[in-house]
Amino acid sequence: MKRLTILGSTGSVGKSTLTVVRNNPDKFKVTALAAGKNIQVMAEQCLEFRPQYAAMADEVSAKELRQLLIEQGCKTEVFFGEQAACDLAALNDVDQVMSGIVGVAGLLPTLAAIRAGKQILLANKESLITSGRFFMDAVAKHNAQLLPIDSEHNAIFQSLPEVIQRNLGRGDLKQYGIANIILTGSGGPFRHTPLEQLAFVTPDQACAHPNWSMGRKISVDSATMMNKGLEYIEACCLFNASAAEMEVVVHPQSVIHSMVRYQDGSVIAQLGTPDMCTPIAYAMAYPNRIASGVEPLDFYSLGTLTFSKPDYERYPCLKLAIEACHAGQAATTVLNAANEEIVKIFLQNGISFTDIAIINRQVVEKLNLSEPQSIEEVLQIDNLARDLAIKTIRSFIR
C-alpha cells in the first residue's frame, strides 16, 4: 500500500486525487493533507480519510480546523504555514507526494519532497516554469522520481520510451528516434468569438471551459491559452526538448491529450475522456494501471476530431510564453508571477480580458533580468515581477 501526502487537497487536483484513493482503498493510504484556507472541505476530507496530519496556510484556519475535528472525534494533528507543508511533503513514512498547490506557493513544499527522495506527482507546473534547471538537478541529486500530472505532459510521458520516462529532463529525444512533441490544447471557450468582443468577456464566461472541470485561475489561463504556453515551458524542461522539437496544435475536442512524433513517421498519442482522474491514477499506480473511475472513451459517439494551428492574434499569451521559454528562466519566472497577479485582478472584474496579455507583455519586456543562480534568486525575481505587475495593473483598473 502506498502512503500519500496531498499538497493542495481542497483544490481541483487534490479532490480528484482523493477520488482515485476512494476507488482504490486497498492500494493507497492518505497520511497527510495540506491546503490553503478552505476549512470546511479540509474538515470533510479529514473525517473521511483520517490522515495522521493536516496543514492549513495560516494559524486562524488551522485553529478552526483543529476545533472542528476535535468536536467530531478526529485525531488528525493540525499544523499551519509553509514550513508545515514542507514537513508533510518530506515525512519519512510517505511514499508519494501529490504536488497540487497552485502557483509558486507550491515550489518550496515540492522541493522538500524532492530532497526527501519521494515519488512526486507533479501538478504544480509553476515549479518547473520558475525553477526548471534547479528543480531537475535536485530530482537527479536526491534520486527522487517525477511523474507529470498535467493531462498533456502525462500523455507525452505515456507515449515516450521507458528509458526517457526514467530519465526526465536529461534524455536525448533524437537518440531515441523522436522527431518532436505535439502539445494539444482545446483553444478554450473563445475560439470563435470575434476578436473585438474579447474585451467584454466576463470572469464567469472565461471560467466556463467547454471540456474540463478546473479551478478559476487555470480556467482563465486556458481561455487566454497562457496555460498552453506554460505547459510548453514545462514540456521543454521535462522532456529536454528544443524549440524545433516542440509543436502546439489546437484540438477543440480534448480527446487526444498530446502526441509524440517519431522519426520513422509514426505518431503515438494518448486518448481519453477529459477527466483529471485518468492521468492522476496513471501516475499514482506507475508503472502499473488501476481503476480511475472515469467513463471509458466511446469511439462511436466521438464524431469528428479536428486540429488547427494556434492563432497568435487571438492567443497573444501563448506567443509570449513561447518567447519567454527560449529567452530563459528569468523571463519565464517573470511571466508566471506577473500572470498570477494579473489574472487575480481580472477575476475580481478589475481589468478586461484583453488587458491580461497586454500587461503580461509590458512586465516581461520591462524586467530584463540576468539568469537566476539559485532558488533564492528565483524567488527574488518572482517578487520583483509581482510588484511591477501590481504597479502596471493600476493604470488599467476599470
Curated annotation (Swiss-Prot):
Keywords: Isoprene biosynthesis, Manganese, Metal-binding, NADP, Oxidoreductase
Gene Ontology BP, a term: isopentenyl diphosphate biosynthetic process, methylerythritol 4-phosphate pathway involved in terpenoid biosynthetic process
Stored InterPro entries: DXP_reductoisomerase, DXP_reductoisomerase_C, DXP_reductoisomerase_N, DXPR_C, DXPR_C_sf, NAD(P)-bd_dom_sf
Binding site for NADPH: 10-13, 36-38, 124, 126, 215
Principal EC category: oxidoreductase
Cofactor: Mg(2+); Mn(2+)
Pathway given in the UniProt record: Isoprenoid biosynthesis; isopentenyl diphosphate biosynthesis via DXP pathway; isopentenyl diphosphate from 1-deoxy-D-xylulose 5-phosphate: step 1/6
Entry binding sites for 1-deoxy-D-xylulose 5-phosphate: 125, 151-152, 186, 209, 222, 227-228, 231
EC number: 1.1.1.267
Family: Belongs to the DXR family.
Subunit structure: Homodimer.
Descriptive protein name: 1-deoxy-D-xylulose 5-phosphate reductoisomerase
Primary gene name: dxr
